[in-house]
Swiss-Prot record:
SMART domains per the UniProt record, alphabetical: KH (SM00322), S1 (SM00316)
Record-listed Mg(2+) binding positions: D485, D491
Gene name in the database record: pnp
Localization (cell): Cytoplasm
Subunit: Component of the RNA degradosome, which is a multiprotein complex involved in RNA processing and mRNA degradation.
A biological-process GO annotation: RNA processing
Annotated ranges, domain KH: 552-611
Family listed: Belongs to the polyribonucleotide nucleotidyltransferase family.
Record-annotated membrane-spanning stretches: none
Job of this protein: Involved in mRNA degradation. Catalyzes the phosphorolysis of single-stranded polyribonucleotides processively in the 3'- to 5'-direction.
Protein name: Polyribonucleotide nucleotidyltransferase
Length: 712
């Protein structure tokens, strides 16, 4: 059980790969570490293909264990449950660059499980998990055309930084993860603080160059510990069947792909498939329907790609750099805080913005502790958006991933908490989809935020680019359709403002994408983005000056932090009383910032006035109106300035002799008092003498006579 270990320097960090001691029944397993952040990655690959399997069943599970950070999970059950949003996103991050590296026709089931078992608060586990997965797959012997490397690139003080720490990332204007082989970039995921196309491309190239050391060391690791390569060969092509399907379907498929309307085109393609299947299976019952459909799909790809490379119009008749027709409506929902419908061709998003208070912020429980998120973005992709029926329930991996990409696109222009003290939630409902619904969500979100009066720094638009490449010939496509995404070689999404890029996501299905191609794609995307921004700015040039009548107004005031306890009161009594009386929501920060949320301005002003009274300093000789809070034998306690108690001694109630305080004062009675003294213990002495209090005694004349006769 002697482990095989490979260790190397990667930028400022040390990476360790270890295998052979743990999970020996798995096909391959690697313990990957980077400066005490450790992820255990296992790969299990089935030797046999499941009967009837016609797709590649690759599953990636990423899971974080709280023991990695020396913590016990919260909640009733005290154990980890379903994957968090962050775990889902990292699982997708691992999946995307490795999936294209398996050969076409490989249908053996593979499961990758990455478990975070130790975490250094300065090192994010996502990169470690990607490196570990690459190493484990390379060791396993499966037909994987890797290994891949992975790098995170930051941009601090106008310099690229390789694999910045968590602390360094807070100062960075860029968070970019790039993965690829020794020859080509395969995946990019990033958010940026409005960087230029040239800066983004340079960051991708920098990250790809730097990760070569990872690839080299994994190759050396495989030489030492790798399993024999599987003797896998793709199934032989059924040339006779291919020719039969071509004869029956090729011309008809070409005609179908001249139908510009999606549903009509799909109906025609489905009819062709049904007809060809019926004809061929009638001749030979042993022919598989799946095999026929695969050949037809390949014909569809050949037709679409061939026409594009030949310079012919695209599926819907557009040129390569034309954006589909745009339609924008804002303020479409009467009772919401902000709303917009953004339509691009047959893709449509209904975006809705909602404003809330600090207590609406999302509390995220991460390995390193809790953090609060003030900007929430949720993306929903219902089945009706593509004319289908299906399950409606919790969000799927794709919805979580698209929502995060759209959020990244808008995040750079969001105002700070000081500029706009609201928690903001955007929901994008995809009501129609035919390509790039995530970028439609970016556009819709930008418009909905402006409709809600959120002072975003600039309008943001997003565009999806595609690529068709054969040998040295390639064509970059702007605003791709769903079919072009499916049949093309690249999905390249760019969001940004007029000044630069805020988010970039790239998934490449082939090797050989050069920096030149990426440069052309970025510049072509910029032109498309400017066109969309022109149309958006015509519809809504700037954020609305006023918030919706239905949105809460947040009024901010500052108090001495030492006075916070007075505003809250014992057991929260004072602040609870204020909120219940006025129907407002009150949040107090540790620095003494008080935020009052109210739909009624008068209620907010009342709360502010009451808080000013509570925190005001009591002044000697000042006269206040207060309420009697307690009556005792030696006097009465009166509450002034919203919560401070002072004593009116029995001798200070009136000039006349007072036998019983209760004869003159009762709890809840409003009286005028003057501050006589504040002693060293901050006790307040009050007097009611010489003040207009209109005191009426509760003593009856008979009682007075009786007392006098008793004295005699």
């Amino acid at each position: 059980m002697t482990p095989i270990v490979k260790q190397f320097k990667y930028g400022q960090h040390t990476v360790t790969l270890e295998t052979g001691a743990i999970a020996r029944q798995a096909t391959a397993a690697v313990m990957a570490s980077m400066d005490d952040t450790t992820v255990f990655v296992s790969v299990v690959a089935k030797k046999e293909v499941k009967e009837g399997q016609d797709f590649f069943p690759l599953t990636v599970n990423y899971q974080e264990r709280t023991y990695a950070a020396g913590r016990i999970p919260g909640g009733f059950f005290k154990r980890e449950g379903r994957p968090s949003e962050n775990e889902t996103l990292i699982a997708r991050l691992i999946d995307r660059p490795i999936r294209p590296l398996f050969p076409e026709g490989f249908f053996n089931e593979i499961q990758i499980v990455a478990t975070v078992v130790s975490v250094n608060p300065q090192i994010s586990p996502d990169l470690v998990a990607m490196i570990g997965a690459s190493a484990a797959l390379s060791l396993s012997g499966v037909p994987f055309n890797g290994p891949i490397g992975a790098a995170r690139v930051g941009f601090i003080n106008d310099q690229f930084v390789l694999n910045p720490t968590i602390t360094e990332q807070k100062q960075s204007r860029l968070d970019l993860v790039v993965a690829g082989t020794d020859k080509a970039v395969l995946m990019v995921e990033s958010e940026a603080d409005i960087l230029s196309e040239e800066q983004m491309l340079a960051a991708v190239v920098f990250g790809h160059q730097q990760q070569q050391i990872v690839i080299e060391n994994i190759k050396e690791f495989v030489k030492e510990a790798g399993k024999p390569r599987w003797d896998w060969q793709p199934a032989e092509a059924n040339t006779a069947l291919i020719n039969q399907v071509k004869a029956l379907a090729e011309t008809r498929i070409g005609d179908a792909y001249r139908i510009t309307e999606k549903q009509a085109r799909y109906e025609q393609i489905d009819a062709i498939k049904a007809d060809v299947i019926a004809q061929l299976t009638a001749q030979d019952e042993t022919i598989s329907e799946g095999a026929i459909i695969d050949i037809i799909t390949a014909l569809e790809s050949s037709v679409v790609r061939g026409r594009i490379l030949a310079g012919e119009p695209r599926i819907d008749g557009r040129t390569v750099d034309t954006v589909r027709a745009l339609n924008i409506c804002t303020g479409v929902l009467p009772r919401t805080h902000g709303s917009a419908i953004f339509t691009r061709g047959e893709t449509q998003a209904l975006a809705v913005a909602t404003l809330g208070t600090e207590r609406d912020a999302q509390i995220i429980d991460e390995l390193t502790g809790e953090k609060s998120d003030r900007f929430l973005f949720h993306y929903n992709f219902p089945p009706y958006s593509v004319g289908e029926t299906g399950m409606i329930g919790s969000p799927k991996r794709r919805e979580i991933g698209h929502g995060r990409l759209a959020k990244r696109g808008v995040l750079a222009v969001m105002p700070s908490a000081e500029e706009f003290p609201y928690v903001v939630r955007v929901v994008s409902e995809i009501t129609e989809s035919n390509g790039s619904s995530s970028m439609a969500s970016v556009c819709g979100a930008s418009l909905a935020l402006m409709d809600a009066g959120v002072p975003i720094k600039a309008t943001v638009a997003g565009i999806a680019m595609g690529l068709v490449k054969e040998d040295e010939k390639f064509v970059v496509l702007s605003d791709i359709l769903g079919d072009e995404d499916h049949l093309g070689d690249m999905d390249f999404k760019v969001a940004g403002t007029r000044k630069g890029i805020t988010a970039l996501q790239m998934d490449i299905k082939i090797e050989g994408i050069t920096p030149e191609i990426m440069h052309i794609a970025l510049n072509q995307a910029k032109g498309a983005r400017m066109h969309i921004l022109n149309v958006m700015e015509q519809a809504l040039p700037a954020p609305r000056a006023d918030l919706s009548d239905f949105a809460p107004r947040i009024h901010t005031m500052k108090i001495d932090p030492k006075k916070i306890k007075d505003v809250i009161g014992k057991g929260g009594a004072v602040i609870r009383s204020l909120t219940e009386e006025t129907g407002t929501s009150i949040d107090i920060d540790d620095d003494g910032t008080v935020k009052i949320a109210a739909t009624d301005n008068n209620a907010a002003k009342m709360v502010m006035s009451r808080i000013e009274e509570i925190v005001a300093e009591v002044e000697v000789n000042a006269i206040y109106t207060g309420k009697v809070s307690r009556v005792v034998d030696f006097g009465a306690f009166v509450t002034i300035l919203g919560g401070k108690e002072g004593l009116v001694h029995i001798s200070q109630i009136t000039d006349a002799r007072v036998e019983r305080v209760s004869d003159y004062l009762s709890v809840g009675q409003e009286v005028n008092v003057k501050v006589v003294e504040i002693d060293r213990q901050n006790r307040i002495r009050l007097t009611m003498k010489d003040l207009d209090n209109n005191l009426s005694t509760n003593v009856t004349p008979e009682a007075v006579v009786q007392e006098e006769s008793t004295e005699n």
